[in-house]
Amino acid sequence: MSTLLPFPDLNLMPDSQSSTAGTTAGDTVVTGKLEVKSEPIEEWQTPPSSTSDQSANTDLIAEFIRISELFRSAFKPLQVKGLDGVSVYGLDSGAIVAVPEKENRELIEPPPGFKDNRVSTVVVSPKFERPRELARIAILGHEQRKELRQVMKRTRMTYESLRIHLMAESMKNHVLGQGRRRRSDMAAAYIMRDRGLWLNYDKHIVGPVTGVEVGDIFFYRMELCVLGLHGQTQAGIDCLTAERSATGEPIATSIVVSGGYEDDEDTGDVLVYTGHGGQDHQHKQCDNQRLVGGNLGMERSMHYGIEVRVIRGIKYENSISSKVYVYDGLYKIVDWWFAVGKSGFGVFKFRLVRIEGQPMMGSAVMRFAQTLRNKPSMVRPTGYVSFDLSNKKENVPVFLYNDVDGDQEPRHYEYIAKAVFPPGIFGQGGISRTGCECKLSCTDDCLCARKNGGEFAYDDNGHLLKGKHVVFECGEFCTCGPSCKSRVTQKGLRNRLEVFRSKETGWGVRTLDLIEAGAFICEYAGVVVTRLQAEILSMNGDVMVYPGRFTDQWRNWGDLSQVYPDFVRPNYPSLPPLDFSMDVSRMRNVACYISHSKEPNVMVQFVLHDHNHLMFPRVMLFALENISPLAELSLDYGLADEVNGKLAICN
């Protein structure tokens, strides 16, 4: 810009006292039309002309005069002291007031579909409307929070199962030339919305969303909408808009920080967030921002002391996408100002400070886990017993960590990556030398697909489509190549795991990687013995694991009965009652240290690939949900209710 403009320093807050001296009591607060902060902004905004002619200069001056007037109106002296010293508008203004914690507020019941997560009999109109009122979830007891956490998990499981199902169908139709691939993440969300399966969709939640915990990870923005965590698919600021607010004021409730604005500054607990607007399709600032829509909503939230939820988008390479979204908790907006950004245009900035007393930020945990994977001894100088418990028998090393005591018990066992089947255990005809005759990869009508009921068990990313009694994979006598999508569990461990010592569970297992829902983790390995052999060995004190006692959590994965009322769980191929055991007294693997839980994040799926004997399937473990780095793995061993959270190496 070639000329100096006659307006104040934009880095300074306008003087509210002087700016309001000439106003009258009848003046109204100026609010503009809602404009959301897109990431990136969808609509092209023409950059200002670089010429220095008089008309262009006059227009620019007029624009900043308009912004200054907007500032003045935003700080009009129409405030009175409210409860706890909070400044609010006059009683006749109709403004939304932040209610103190001890005061009565609207206590909402869970919306339809939240209590028992069943399909509503009334299909929601595709013309979906955002909520028209703010609400804060009532403070609940431990059991209520625990129950609603499970409801949230089931909803996420339904979303993931539906998304994977739709993606597989879309890929299949695309290969057959029956249509182009569609966004399965969006399609799954819209289907669930039309079935009334979105949570909190009838209220605009302020503060924490019940069931969502700090550190929860999401792969898609649409999932945030399904849970009511952030209601915008592209916009960075989610707020109750002025058009929908009874008071005509927007109130911001959550933001997504994904690095789309060059003026953002993020140090974790303190965040300087750039307002919306003024960007082109290359994410470059090309125009000045205005105090409207989400920007005004952020200012109003600061004014009323309303906290906002912060979700961070983090680059993380995985089989689904190159970015994940992490819920990092609640922040308070403590300051805002208008400044000239790096590109030379005026932008609004908001300083947010994280509220104390919350768990560690999920984004910080992910960064710590990344450093731990690459330089473990630098992050933890002491405590490591072994950097590879498997002695290179797994595809990736298995760490052994103990900073509690001097116990090194896991090193005393022979590590095996796969279960050992003693010779002759199958009897005559147990080993089948037949397989499919596909080339490179299997087709839908191959022998192995027919064994699975006419469909493949996995999608192209190796995720389990739906749980079954047993899954048949391509085996040694199949002619398809190693890249066949029907070869998943036989490839072994892919995620880095750590066996760690715990005061609560004895030994436990946590992941150093982000494990996606439906992904294969590892095999549960031991020496397979018959029932008679197990009885004899047990009398000698050998430790036994009984695969037939694991709960059938696989029934929940891929269960779309909430979405499609006529959905029927697959009953073919079937599996007879299992009557074998695994002796883990001398030979075992990392899975044997996974703790027991009635609310597991890992499920058992029986698989056959190197033989066809239904009485002796392999015990494979899959993720029931997205498992964050450093989260502990847990299984439901089928133990009594009073046994929970303790080392359950014998069931």
From Swiss-Prot:
InterPro entries: H3-K9-MeTrfase_plant (IPR025794), H3K9_HMTase_SUVAR3-9 (IPR051357), Pre-SET_dom (IPR007728), PUA-like_sf (IPR015947), SET_dom (IPR001214), SET_dom_sf (IPR046341), SRA-YDG_sf (IPR036987), SRA_YDG (IPR003105)
Main location as per UniProt: nucleus
An individual GO BP term: epigenetic regulation of gene expression
Annotated ranges, domain SET: 495-638
Keyword match Secreted: no
One cellular component (GO) term of this entry: chromosome, centromeric region
Biological role stated in the UniProt entry: Histone methyltransferase family member that plays a central role in gene silencing. Together with MORC6 and SUVH9, regulates the silencing of some transposable elements (TEs). According to PubMed:15775980, it is required for normal methylation of 'Lys-9' and 'Lys-27' of histone H3, 'Lys-20' of H4, and cytosine, but PubMed:19043555 see no significant effect on histone methylation when the gene is mutated. According to PubMed:19043555, the protein does not bind S-adenosyl-L-methionine and lacks methyltransferase activity.
Protein name, as recorded: Histone-lysine N-methyltransferase family member SUVH2
The encoding gene: SUVH2
